[in-house]
């Protein structure tokens, strides 16, 4: 059997790239898929026969009766359920500064979920041309707080401003483009790979948000690596979090825990002598960052009541 990387799934056909010959083939899944040591994100009652092959999977395949059949999947180092992508090296998290308007709440929620998944994040802020210079400067000052945790880029995809500075991060990596619908992920991908077959749409004036332009996850080769364009994220679920351990997914909080009177058991809420709250008062923690933490804590706590 030969080994290949899954690039795309469309209408029952898997597009795979042979890792030795580099040839792209059309393949189908065998009736009963072999999935040794695969940790699935599907429901517990899922079986090998209905196991979902994800974009990014490394698979074994063979030719049978003039049809290439995927026989088995190699163990994944990580995976996402929505979108269905496996073996991710990093996430390129794209936010627009306007249209749709930027929200610190949404940024913090994305970072929280990706931190739980133990995925490296690169932050990209698009549509810088649509802000007045003074407003852009103000936004950059506020966003600079996040630079101590993630690589950081400002871009204008349509005019290709900042695109060249971004290219090196894709080398030898499988990179997932993530972000709210309409922030310019497909436009960014088109700026990086002009011949990629993509459709971009204008923002809905009535809703102030984007329409879906990507329906299925797909791997595109670029600069020695692969970029995964995914459907827009319309729902960010916090149901996998526990209120008491939420704080552990805030690296900027963790570095101040040593100053908490209650140490690692401190929730950074009502406790006295809290190192995180002291750092907040001293301007070392962004106020919106802490406020969003409290909001997420209450949201998760309320979910447990039902």
UniProtKB/Swiss-Prot annotation:
It comes from the Bacteria. Its EC number is 3.6.1.-. InterPro entries: G_CP_dom, P-loop_NTPase, Ribosome_biogen_GTPase_RsgA, RsgA_GTPase_dom. Transmembrane segments: none annotated. One of several proteins that assist in the late maturation steps of the functional core of the 30S ribosomal subunit. Helps release RbfA from mature subunits. May play a role in the assembly of ribosomal proteins into the subunit. Circularly permuted GTPase that catalyzes slow GTP hydrolysis, GTPase activity is stimulated by the 30S ribosomal subunit. Belongs to the TRAFAC class YlqF/YawG GTPase family. RsgA subfamily. This is Small ribosomal subunit biogenesis GTPase RsgA. The gene is rsgA.
């Amino acid at each position: 059997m030969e080994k290949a990387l899954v690039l795309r799934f469309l209408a029952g056909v898997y597009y795979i790239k042979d890792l030795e010959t580099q040839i792209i083939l059309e393949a189908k899944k065998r009736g009963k898929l072999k999935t040794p040591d695969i940790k699935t994100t599907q429901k517990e009652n899922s079986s090998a026969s209905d196991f979902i092959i994800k974009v990014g999977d490394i698979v074994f395949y063979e030719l049978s009766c003039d049809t290439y059949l995927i026989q088995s999947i190699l163990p994944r180092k990580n995976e996402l359920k929505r979108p269905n992508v496996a073996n991710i090296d990093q996430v390129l998290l794209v936010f627009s500064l306007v249209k749709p308007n930027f929200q610190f709440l949404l940024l913090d929620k994305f970072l929280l979920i990706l931190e739980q998944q133990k995925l490296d994040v690169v932050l990209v802020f698009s549509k810088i041309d649509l802000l007045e210079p003074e407003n852009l400067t103000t936004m950059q000052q506020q966003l600079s707080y996040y630079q101590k945790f993630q690589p950081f880029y400002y871009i204008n995809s349509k005019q290709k401003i900042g695109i060249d500075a971004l290219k090196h991060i894709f080398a030898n990596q499988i990179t997932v483009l993530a972000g709210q619908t309409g922030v310019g992920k497909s436009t960014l991908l088109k700026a990086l790979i002009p011949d990629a077959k993509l459709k971009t749409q204008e923002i809905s004036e009535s809703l102030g948000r984007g329409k879906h332009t990507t329906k299925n996850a797909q791997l595109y080769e670029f600069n020695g690596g692969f970029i995964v364009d995914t459907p827009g994220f319309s729902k960010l679920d916090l149901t996998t979090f526990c209120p008491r351990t939420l704080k552990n997914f805030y690296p900027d909080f963790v570095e101040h825990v040593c100053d908490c009177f209650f140490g690692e058991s401190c929730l950074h809420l009502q406790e006295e002598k809290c190192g995180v709250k002291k750092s907040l008062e001293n301007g070392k923690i962004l106020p919106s960052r802490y406020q969003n933490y409290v909001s997420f804590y209450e949201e998760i706590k309320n979910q447990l009541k039902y």
